[in-house]
């Protein structure tokens, strides 16, 4: 860490290598009527050249109410009250994460459907022009309101310094998001979403969830007991 008064930027955090191979962990909550579900992997850093395309991808996949994963798990299958995905952009590579809470008996099915959506947006059902247009609009429509207060402006300036971004990053946000093409969304989905290497963490009842996960073809879960 730089000494006090030293205005040199702090060194970037060490890059964490991606984990190869899918893994499942169940944190024991015996008798739980619901499971807390997280599925994720390493994503991208804030300065990544694909930042804007990844925002659009996330909006299509799980970043808004009408996104694919929420429509599947909530609207079609009624497994949950809501499901969402996020890319957590940091100085180093932050996580990509799906999060939701589902009924215990449908936990494995919810995991299965989530992975199907990951695979579909990569290959069999890439983002459509209509989905991409809606995603771009959701990201840009209210963007000017992010700078209405002094606190918001200070926070924005802090981001420029923290992530070492160009001074015109926020001015360029809307045009760069609007320039994201359907093909770019497919490209970044194939590049940054790697379902075979994703980690699944479930907080729930292992007696119900573990055999159901294995019946769906997932690897045998690691059972984690928290005192």
Identify the meaning behind each predicted range.
Residues 1, 114-115:
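PAPS/PAP-binding and catalytic site of the sulfotransferase fold
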Residues 3-48, 59-110, 131, 152-156, ...:
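Non-catalytic beta-strand/loop surface segments
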Residues 37, 167-170:
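Acidic/histidine-rich, surface-exposed loop or edge segments in extracytoplasmic proteins
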Residues 39, 55, 73, 114, ...:
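Divalent metal-coordination and catalytic microenvironments
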Residues 133-140, 144:
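Small-residue-rich helix-loop
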Residues 149:
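Hard-cation-handling environments
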Residues 202-205:
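Structural motif
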């Amino acid at each position: 860490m730089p000494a006090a008064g030293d205005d040199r930027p702090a060194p970037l955090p060490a890059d964490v290598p991606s984990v190869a191979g899918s893994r499942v962990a169940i944190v024991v909550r015996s008798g739980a009527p619901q499971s807390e579900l997280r599925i994720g992997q390493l994503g991208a850093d804030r300065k990544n050249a694909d930042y804007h395309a990844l925002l659009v991808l996330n909006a299509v996949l799980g970043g808004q109410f009408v996104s694919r994963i929420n429509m599947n798990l909530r609207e079609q299958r009624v497994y949950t009250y809501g499901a969402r995905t996020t890319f957590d952009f940091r100085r180093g590579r932050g996580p990509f994460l799906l999060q939701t809470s589902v009924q215990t008996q449908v936990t494995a099915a919810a995991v299965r459907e989530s992975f199907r959506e990951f695979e579909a947006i990569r290959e069999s059902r890439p983002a459509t022009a209509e989905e991409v247009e809606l995603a771009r609009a959701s990201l840009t429509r209210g963007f000017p309101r992010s700078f209405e207060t002094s606190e918001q402006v200070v926070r924005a300036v802090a981001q420029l310094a923290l992530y070492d971004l160009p001074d015109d990053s926020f001015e360029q946000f809307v045009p760069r998001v609007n320039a994201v093409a359907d093909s770019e969304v497919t490209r970044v989905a194939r590049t940054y979403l790697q379902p075979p290497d994703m980690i699944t963490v479930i907080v729930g009842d292992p007696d119900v969830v573990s055999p159901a996960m294995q019946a769906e073809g997932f690897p045998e879960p690691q059972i984690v007991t928290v005192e």
